[in-house]
């Protein structure tokens, strides 16, 4: 006969709880919704085991799995075996099974679609995978760019190593990236050619998507004759702007070790320098995702230099995400918060800011007017008017 389990603690007995005056606690415990508690535990499991998703995404980018599916044609789905056959020198007999498990994970995050079909004589099912709507951003487009490079940057060893110093930075101060590499991320670029290449490629990929949308929606480039792009990297942002506004003379301004790799672009002059020292003169100054890399003090120094470089009625066009003052659970809110914490680990005082904080910076730098103009794919285009 099976032994009836008993509690080793008499106070756990319901009747004992009542006798001890704990009836309310007992009732509260047993009133808890079991389904709700299960959902909370399942979510906790997802959090505890979330590392495989970014790692699998990185491997998918390296193997170009999404590109292989895209090459098959619109709305096509491929089995893991078909995808494995398209890999270069795929001599591993277990590759299809491994890819199937990886793609299954990506399907749970809606990166790919999945249809299970009858496996026929082999028994079981065969899963076929296609591209979900978000996947197009991780497949090279007509400009040869994707957000895959941004994944490679964030998953690269230079950035990954920074996270190991986050606890130390919280307790002792300092910037995790600096603790690992002995310098800030921007000077580190000049010492590591491979990292510099990945960084520039990631910035190029993201900028290309965003600036094309901005040029279509934002009309503030009209009547500008000389536009200075501060922190313009290799000049691709100005390439898009000047191709749409040929009358604009573009000045691509960045650190010398960045500018030396910049290609020749019609209508664009590359100028090396330091934005904390001085900025070339222009009718308007453009800055996309620059201020979020720096502390308020550094931003003020840069903005004051912008103010000096502008004529009366000139403007700084700032493109940045805007942090929401109270956390939300939307994909955009999560993306902004994730980037904010990345900046905390990698940049000298960098952070995402609220609209109110941008207005405070603009006013402190001497600008007469702060004007949020339009919202484009998660970014705000804001004008600081002199």
UniProtKB/Swiss-Prot annotation:
InterPro entries linked:
COMT-like, O_MeTrfase_dom, Plant_O-MeTrfase_dimerisation, SAM-dependent_MTases_sf, WH-like_DNA-bd_sf, WH_DNA-bd_sf
Record: residues binding S-adenosyl-L-methionine: 254
Q: List the active-site residues.
A: 292
What name goes with this protein? O-methyltransferase 12
Q: What does this protein do?
A: O-methyltransferase participating in the biosynthesis of natural products derived from phenylethylamine, including mescaline, a natural hallucinogen potentially used in psychotherapeutic treatments. Catalyzes the O-methylation of dopamine, 4-hydroxy-3,5-dimethoxyphenethylamine, 4,5-dihydroxy-3-methoxyphenethylamine and N-methyl-4,5-dihydroxy-3-methoxyphenethylamine. Also involved in the conversion of N-methyl-4-hydroxy-3,5-dimethoxyphenethylamine to N-methylmescaline.
Temperature dependence of the activity comes to: Optimum temperature is 45 degrees Celsius.
PROSITE patterns from the UniProt entry: SAM_OMT_II (PS51683)
Q: What is its EC number?
A: 2.1.1.-
Its quaternary organisation is: Homodimer.
Query: Could you say which residues bind S-adenosyl-L-homocysteine here?
Result: 207, 231, 254, 274, 288
Pathway as given in its UniProt record: Aromatic compound metabolism; Alkaloid biosynthesis
Question: Which superkingdom heads the taxonomic lineage of this protein's source?
Answer: Eukaryota
Q: Which gene encodes it?
A: OMT12
Swiss-Prot/TrEMBL keywords = Alkaloid metabolism, Methyltransferase, S-adenosyl-L-methionine, Transferase
Protein's organism: Lophophora williamsii (Peyote)
- What family is this protein classified in? Belongs to the class I-like SAM-binding methyltransferase superfamily. Cation-independent O-methyltransferase family.
User: What GO terms are given for molecular function?
Assistant: O-methyltransferase activity; protein dimerization activity
State the top-level EC class. Answer: transferase
User: Which GO terms are recorded in the biological process aspect for this UniProt protein?
Assistant: methylation
Tissue specificity of this protein: Expressed at high levels in all tissues.
Which Pfam families does the entry mention? Dimerisation, Methyltransf_2
Q: Which reaction does it catalyse?
A: 4-hydroxy-3,5-dimethoxyphenethylamine + S-adenosyl-L-methionine = mescaline + S-adenosyl-L-homocysteine + H(+); dopamine + S-adenosyl-L-methionine = 4-methoxytyramine + S-adenosyl-L-homocysteine + H(+)
pH dependence of function = Optimum pH is 7.5-8.
Q: Does the keyword S-adenosyl-L-methionine apply?
A: yes
């Amino acid at each position: 006969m099976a032994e009836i389990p008993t509690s080793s603690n008499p106070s756990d007995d319901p009747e004992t709880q009542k006798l001890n005056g704990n009836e309310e606690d007992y009732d509260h415990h047993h009133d808890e919704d079991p389904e709700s508690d299960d959902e909370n535990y399942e979510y906790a499991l997802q959090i505890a085991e979330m590392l495989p998703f970014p790692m699998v995404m990185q491997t998918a980018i390296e193997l170009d799995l999404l590109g292989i599916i895209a090459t098959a044609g619109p709305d096509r789905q491929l089995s893991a075996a078909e995808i494995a056959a398209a890999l270069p020198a795929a001599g591993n007999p277990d590759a299809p099974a491994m890819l199937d498990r990886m793609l299954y994970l990506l399907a749970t995050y809606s990166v790919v679609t999945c249809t299970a079909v009858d496996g026929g004589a082999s028994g079981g099912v065969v899963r076929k995978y296609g591209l979900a709507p978000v996947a197009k951003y991780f497949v090279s487009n007509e400009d040869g760019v994707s957000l895959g490079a941004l994944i490679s940057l964030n998953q690269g060893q230079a950035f990954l190593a920074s996270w190991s110093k986050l606890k130390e930075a919280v307790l002792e101060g300092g910037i995790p990236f600096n603790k690992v590499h002995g310098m800030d991320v921007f000077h580190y670029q000049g010492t590591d050619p491979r990292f510099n290449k990945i960084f520039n490629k990631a910035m190029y990929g993201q900028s290309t998507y965003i600036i094309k949308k901005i040029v279509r929606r934002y009309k503030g480039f009209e009547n500008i004759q000389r536009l200075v792009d501060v922190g313009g990297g290799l000049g691709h942002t100005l390439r898009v702007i000047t191709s749409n506004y040929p009358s604009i003379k573009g000045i691509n301004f960045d650190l010398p070790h960045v500018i030396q790799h910049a290609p020749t672009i019609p209508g664009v002059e590359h100028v090396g320098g330091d934005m904390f020292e001085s900025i070339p003169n222009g009718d308007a100054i453009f800055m996309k995702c620059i201020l979020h890399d720096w502390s308020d003090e550094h931003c003020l120094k840069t903005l004051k230099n912008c103010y000096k470089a502008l004529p009366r009625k000139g403007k700084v066009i700032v493109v940045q995400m805007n942090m929401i003052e109270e956390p939300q659970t939307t994909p955009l809110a999560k993306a902004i918060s994730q980037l904010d914490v990345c900046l905390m680990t990698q940049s000298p005082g960098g952070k995402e800011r609220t609209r109110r904080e941008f207005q405070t910076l603009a006013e402190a730098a001497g600008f007469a007017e702060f004007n949020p103009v339009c919202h484009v794919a998660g970014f705000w285009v804001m004008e600081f008017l002199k």
